[in-house]
């Protein structure tokens, strides 16, 4: 037998196992694939606290394999294709009886990216609940559990056609903490890069602290965030992927590791960098940050990055893009429509000439945004069911004020379909400078932080603008909100 009570840690695990035994007997739905028992990491054909302990050791890097002979497949309880903190969270929920069975999703079908030539124009905002590829192409998901597969498809399409493909976790990621800063070191194929993130700690609350990650900086009211007992982490995004202008493509520490010819826009390199930061936080308890309670925010171009980071990493509990403009919370189709109506708004055709935020693969959609098999309402939906608060300023037409409203409305419909409408908010208030964050929006931000980072009951139901915008549903959607 693998487990011997040789130390206190194993003894505690045993006691927890005993305490959960009644709960486990009441939960027989541990699904098997041939001889595979999902969640059974030590090969004893049971799922218990010992398996939870093994999962923790694996995520902390203390072990690289599981002793049960089932490999890592049994640990991938959300069927996402990777083992991460989400799997550990589901395993905990199963042991506590808050979910009925494992795995929590359906096996993911390999996603075949369609060719540009095969894409069919669609002037409306695509249905976030309809599969676009594979054997289920043209069919809608019929249960919440299928969102895992649909989410993976949206993510793959967005990376292939817009952002660039985010590489998997580097071969080695380490973290070290000193002088209120965590240094992250990533190694791949004999190359290494490092970057440091400053941490500002609150004077209230208890360690390990929840934290808001600021992309390059934090343009919200940081003093109010600290008062809530939430730490602030500054992520040096421009070090990872430069974006001074279009000529910055291929520059930054990401490209030092993967090569300057890697077709990635700056935003996806930032998402990769925050992935590595979270990996480092998970293995560096000296940093006194709770890696399960992380938010991300950024203003303007950094807001585009914040949305991409939250969309592509499910470990982010709360995403707050602020006045992010087109390529952020403003969609490509809706921006084109606003431009066609005579307003001076940034569009896809313009943005690809301004900077290197996106991969070169996006260029082929210039003048043909209707061929995109997704749009940014679906990018926002990738955050579901996690928290998303869209902070906007209607005074800046260039940022796609109406476009953002339309895109956010469609994204909220996706949240409604998934049964969590209050997990996404939209707040658009003018009368101030770009990314100045007026005091009138602070209660909304506070509510979202309280709910998603502090675990408190807060009213997060907000969808408002101080402009009289209306959503032309007949123009933008030809799909309905599902009921699961």
What does each model-identified segment do?
Residues 282, 323-327, 355-356, 384, ...:
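Cell-envelope and extracellular/periplasmic
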Residues 321-379, 400-408, 414-421:
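Mobile cap/lid helix-loop segments that gate and shape the active-site cleft of serine hydrolases
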Residues 207-212, 228-232, 290-293, 314-318, ...:
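Loop/turn elements at helix/coil->beta-strand transitions in domains of secreted/extracellular proteins
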Residues 277-339, 368:
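Primarily recognizes the serine-hydrolase "nucleophile elbow" in alpha/beta-hydrolase
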Residues 108-196, 201-207, 384-388, 393-484:
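Alpha/beta-hydrolase-fold serine-hydrolase catalytic core, especially in secreted/extracellular enzymes
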Residues 214-285, 325-334:
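Cap/lid segment of the alpha/beta-hydrolase catalytic domain
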Residues 269, 297-299, 321, 359-361, ...:
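Extended catalytic-interface subdomain
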Residues 2-108:
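Cellulosome-associated attachment modules in secreted, modular CAZymes
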């Amino acid at each position: 037998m693998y487990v011997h009570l040789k130390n206190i840690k194993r003894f505690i695990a045993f006691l927890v196992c005993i305490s959960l035994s009644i709960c486990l007997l009441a939960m027989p739905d541990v699904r098997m694939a041939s001889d595979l028992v999902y969640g059974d990491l030590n090969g004893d054909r049971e799922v218990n606290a010992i398996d939870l302990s093994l999962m923790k050791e694996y995520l902390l890097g203390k072990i690289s394999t599981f002793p049960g002979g089932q490999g890592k497949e049994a640990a991938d309880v959300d069927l996402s294709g990777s083992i991460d903190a989400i799997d550990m969270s589901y395993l905990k929920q199963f042991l506590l009886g808050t979910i009925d069975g494992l795995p929590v999703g359906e096996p993911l079908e390999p996603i075949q990216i369609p060719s540009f030539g095969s894409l069919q124009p669609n002037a409306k905002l695509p249905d976030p609940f309809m599969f676009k590829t594979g054997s289920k192409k043209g069919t809608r998901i019929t249960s919440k559990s299928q969102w895992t597969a649909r989410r993976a498809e949206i993510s793959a399409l967005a990376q292939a056609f817009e952002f660039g493909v985010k590489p998997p976790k580097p071969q080695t990621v380490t973290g070290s903490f000193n002088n209120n800063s965590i240094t992250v070191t990533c190694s791949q194929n004999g190359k290494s890069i490092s970057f440091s993130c400053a941490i500002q700690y609150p004077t209230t609350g208890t360690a390990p602290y929840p934290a808001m990650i600021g992309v390059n900086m934090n343009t919200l009211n940081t003093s109010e965030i600290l008062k809530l007992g939430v730490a602030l982490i500054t992520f040096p995004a421009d070090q990872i992927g430069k974006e001074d202008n279009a000529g910055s493509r291929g520059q930054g520490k990401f490209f030092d590791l993967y090569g300057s010819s890697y077709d990635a826009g700056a935003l996806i390199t930032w998402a990769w960098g925050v992935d590595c930061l979270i990996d480092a936080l998970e293995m560096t308890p000296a940093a006194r940050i709770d890696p399960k309670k992380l938010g991300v925010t950024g203003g303007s171009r950094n807001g585009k990055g914040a949305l991409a980071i939250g969309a592509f990493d499910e470990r982010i509990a709360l995403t707050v893009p602020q006045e992010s403009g087109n390529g952020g919370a403003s969609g490509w189709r809706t921006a084109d429509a606003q431009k066609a109506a005579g307003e001076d708004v940034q569009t896809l055709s313009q943005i690809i000439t301004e900077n290197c935020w996106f991969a070169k693969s996006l260029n082929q959609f210039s003048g043909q945004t209707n061929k995109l098999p997704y749009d940014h309402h679906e990018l926002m939906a990738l955050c579901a069911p996690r928290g998303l608060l869209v902070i906007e300023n209607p005074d800046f037409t260039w940022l796609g004020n109406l476009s953002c409203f339309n895109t956010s409305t469609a994204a909220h419909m996706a949240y409604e379909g998934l049964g969590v409408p209050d997990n996404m908010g939209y707040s658009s208030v003018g009368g101030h400078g770009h990314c100045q964050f007026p005091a009138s929006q602070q209660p909304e931000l506070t509510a979202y932080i309280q709910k998603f980072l502090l675990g408190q009951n807060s009213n997060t139901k907000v969808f408002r603008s101080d402009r009289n915008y209306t959503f032309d549903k007949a123009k933008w959607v030809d799909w309905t909100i599902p009921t699961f």
